[in-house]
């Protein structure tokens, strides 16, 4: 056949096991590696730690502000009930802005790093986000004592936590793409979920660190009433995040490029072009024969290639490889061209809107959990120290009982139940908990409201909080994965910002019960947009992408009956 000698094995996962081009089915079924930790191979374990520690740090940095907020109130605004002059307190607008600062930065980081990851490559980008996180953290805790105005102090924190958010945001699309491209398809969901589950440990660590620090300062705070010592507490709360950040910096900077990404770049130039233009007449005839399963021409081809188990598939594979070899990357136009088609855009719409609706409720609760605990009567004490300690203990209980277990339910069940079912049931049950809180806010006891929040956290993290991260990593092909994941996550952070800025205002205007109705509506709205998404369990987005280029619209779908179902393929 009239082809060049260079062969590119597009979409193969072989780069994670050896340097030779190995067919995907051989990698999936034939590569046997011993499993050690949590059922993972050594390579999977290293990947989990490298990306997972990043998510531990992300969660710690994002949600520690919830535990620092009461300290800011006592230290700079004279307490919760009244300010230094007896006429005010920590303004809800300023509090919301400071709480939202990292999430605002997230949007820029997710879009910027997602695009750069697709355009320049994963290696070029990965690790740079951690440099930003380290610099921003140092600047936050270096707030000079020469700043006297409480408002100026909060603006200092806001500015550098915004920069911190840029770095954290960049970690989302890059870690998701790298994990997806270096995982076996049958274990991909579990590994991505496992890495994302480190967020639970980050939130848990924030509560534990706060309790330990308050315990260390117990004598000057509780017995002597020297509350200016809280200055050291909040700086340590923020500053301890430097430990994991520095630990993963070098390994990220020296990580090699994913061959799955390198190979996928060639497909961008194929979008919208006729593959036949790259082959001669004989090649064109062979491709037609290979795409006609079951007819007489395939039988003739099988006779000519007696030494091959399936001549048609071998011919298609050969043509796909050669076609990739003669193409060149055009990453800048690939994203727009790909999502110009509704069958692709509906997936981006589903992942983005589901993430947006989830984060309105998720961050509305988590960034204001200390305020909610005080309102339901849990975090009250005889003095400031005891109030802060009870608040930290309340956050710890919610993390242990609902937050962390939810992630691990997802880890163990994501490959059994599938992504779509888990996301649907999570939206339903979390919405139900918010409905109960909304309808009976004033009637339910403190323990009852606390239990509802724990259950909501459990099913939120088991369901949509995990699957909204998994979906963009699996449903989009590698050539647009980083940008698409960044867009989805950025829209989610828009929801988080809305919740951060408006929660305190709305609770003062319409009350906590009506705010819970808003959260309930967001959860049940997520059910509708989940229906746009396919089930990605066992789905190879890169393979489907290649087959669509060769066989036209829904080429893969027509060859596999299970994708004909609305449930597996999504509505519309």
UniProtKB/Swiss-Prot annotation:
The keyword Transport applies. NCBIfam families: 2A0109. Residues 1-47, 121-123, 175-193, 251-346, 417-420, 471-485, 530-572 are cytoplasmic. It is found in: Membrane. The lineage of its organism: Eukaryota, Fungi, Dikarya, Ascomycota, Taphrinomycotina. This is Putative inorganic phosphate transporter C8E4.01c. Residues 69-99, 145-153, 215-229, 368-395, 442-449, 507-508 are extracellular. Coiled coil: none annotated. Residues 286-296 have a biased composition (Basic and acidic residues). GO terms for biological process: monoatomic anion transport; phosphate ion transmembrane transport. The chain crosses the membrane at residues 48-68, 100-120, 124-144, 154-174, 194-214, 230-250, 347-367, 396-416, 421-441, 450-470, 486-506, 509-529. Keywords: Membrane, Phosphate transport, Phosphoprotein, Transmembrane, Transmembrane helix, Transport. It comes from the Eukaryota. The keyword Membrane applies. It is a multi-pass membrane protein. High-affinity transporter for external inorganic phosphate. It comes from Schizosaccharomyces pombe (strain 972 / ATCC 24843) (Fission yeast).
